[in-house]
């Protein structure tokens, strides 16, 4: 049984980790931390976990995290980089759901995240936790940088095309929409129902923090830098990301066969039949990316539609998928969840 600690268990990704791990047959949550809510029972804050998680939140100092086999950081950016080194020195493996270890260029990370990196020496050792790309490296990793939500949907959509060398990588476009839970569980004017409901807007057009992460992953697949325009949007839904991706074909190729072949052995990527249009509700609550590929009017533009639940395949579910790989467990352990409908 893998002993699990969660740092920052009161946010949406934290409670999603608790939901998934509560039914995991080979993992046991032994500590959940929150400085602000220390002493409060988990099932008091989250009644959905009554009868599933018999723990109270504790401070990180009281949590005895060094006795865990693995610790998840479901914290804001900048926390894991301060605390991960001590846990790693104690032999604990770490999965960071924030962005502290995702970008290999530390100076680039500091520019986008507006703070000095506290553990730059760990960045090179961190494995980027996208299993569909780095499965073997994740198995032996001590420190995993769990991908962001937009980067997961965008990379899984573009990768078959880039790996096959059939598109112009100088002018990629990612037009993405997210539900409000992507902003986290905090009080902000823009996330209020009266502000976000019945409305739809783009944001971060001049530059979003996920842009360098996406470019890094696509450049690695391409073997050279890529040109990417990434525009995120906020939609009046709670969960879900819909990425509409555009690229120019440079070779004639059977796109459906290309995508089906690339993901044939991937349990958590579902390539839909030709002509399909995936819906965000079809992946709600599940660790699943659904993809459809189109070539409108048989032209030289390829359009890829990629949908995920931002809290599951875009965060906590992918983190549990990484845990399974790190501890030699079946990759779908605890993740065989049917999406919620309606």
Curated annotation (Swiss-Prot):
Recorded metabolic or biological pathway in which this protein acts: Amino-acid biosynthesis; L-arginine biosynthesis; N(2)-acetyl-L-ornithine from L-glutamate: step 3/4
Span of the signal peptide: none
UniProt entry tagged with the keyword NADP: yes
GO cellular component: cytoplasm
Protein family per UniProt: Belongs to the NAGSA dehydrogenase family. Type 1 subfamily.
Job of this protein: Catalyzes the NADPH-dependent reduction of N-acetyl-5-glutamyl phosphate to yield N-acetyl-L-glutamate 5-semialdehyde.
Gene Ontology biological process terms in this record: L-arginine biosynthetic process
GO molecular function, one term: NADP+ binding
Annotated organism of origin: Chromobacterium violaceum (strain ATCC 12472 / DSM 30191 / JCM 1249 / CCUG 213 / NBRC 12614 / NCIMB 9131 / NCTC 9757 / MK)
InterPro entries: AGPR_AS, AGPR_type-1, NAD(P)-bd_dom_sf, NAGSA_dehydrogenase, Semialdehyde_DH_NAD-bd
CDD domains: AGPR_1_C, AGPR_1_N
EC primary class: oxidoreductase
Keywords: Amino-acid biosynthesis, Arginine biosynthesis, Cytoplasm, NADP, Oxidoreductase
The name this protein goes by in its record: N-acetyl-gamma-glutamyl-phosphate reductase
Reaction catalysed by this enzyme: N-acetyl-L-glutamate 5-semialdehyde + phosphate + NADP(+) = N-acetyl-L-glutamyl 5-phosphate + NADPH + H(+)
Predominant location category: cytoplasm
SUPFAM superfamilies in UniProt: Glyceraldehyde-3-phosphate dehydrogenase-like, C-terminal domain (SSF55347), NAD(P)-binding Rossmann-fold domains (SSF51735)
Active site per database record: 149
EC numbers on record: 1.2.1.38
Protein location: Cytoplasm
């Amino acid at each position: 049984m893998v002993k699990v600690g969660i740092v920052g268990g009161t946010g949406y990704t934290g409670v999603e980790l608790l939901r998934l791990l509560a039914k995991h047959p080979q993992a046991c949550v032994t500590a959940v931390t929150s400085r602000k809510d220390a002493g409060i029972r988990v099932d008091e804050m989250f009644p959905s976990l009554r009868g599933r998680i018999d723990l109270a939140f504790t401070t990180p100092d009281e949590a005895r995290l060094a006795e865990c086999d693995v610790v998840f950081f479901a914290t804001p950016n900048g926390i894991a980089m301060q605390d991960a080194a001590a846990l790693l020195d104690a032999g604990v493996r770490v999965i960071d759901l924030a962005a502290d270890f995702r970008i290999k260029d530390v100076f680039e990370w500091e520019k986008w995240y507006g703070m000095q990196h506290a553990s730059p020496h760990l960045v090179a050792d961190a494995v980027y936790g996208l299993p569909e790309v780095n499965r073997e490296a994740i198995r032996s990793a001590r420190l995993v940088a769990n991908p962001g939500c937009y980067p997961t949907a965008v990379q899984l959509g573009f990768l078959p095309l880039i790996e096959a060398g059939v598109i112009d990588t100088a002018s990629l476009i990612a037009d993405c929409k997210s539900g409000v839970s992507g902003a986290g569980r905090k009080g902000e004017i823009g996330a209020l129902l009266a502000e976000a409901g019945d409305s739809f807007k783009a944001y971060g057009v001049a530059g979003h923090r996920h842009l360098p992460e996406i470019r890094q992953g696509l450049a690695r697949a391409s073997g050279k830098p890529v040109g990417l325009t990434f525009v995120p949007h906020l939609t009046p839904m709670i969960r879900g990301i819909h990425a509409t991706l555009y690229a120019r074909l440079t070779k004639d190729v059977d796109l459906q066969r290309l995508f089906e072949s690339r993901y044939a052995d991937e349990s958590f990527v579902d390539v839909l039949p030709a002509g399909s249009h995936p819906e965000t509700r079809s992946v709600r609550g599940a660790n699943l990316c659904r993809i459809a590929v189109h070539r409108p009017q048989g032209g030289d533009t390829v359009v890829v539609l990629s949908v995920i639940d931002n809290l599951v395949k875009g965060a906590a579910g992918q983190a549990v998928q990484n845990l399974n790989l790190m501890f030699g467990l079946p990759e779908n352990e605890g993740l065989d969840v049917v999406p919620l409908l309606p």
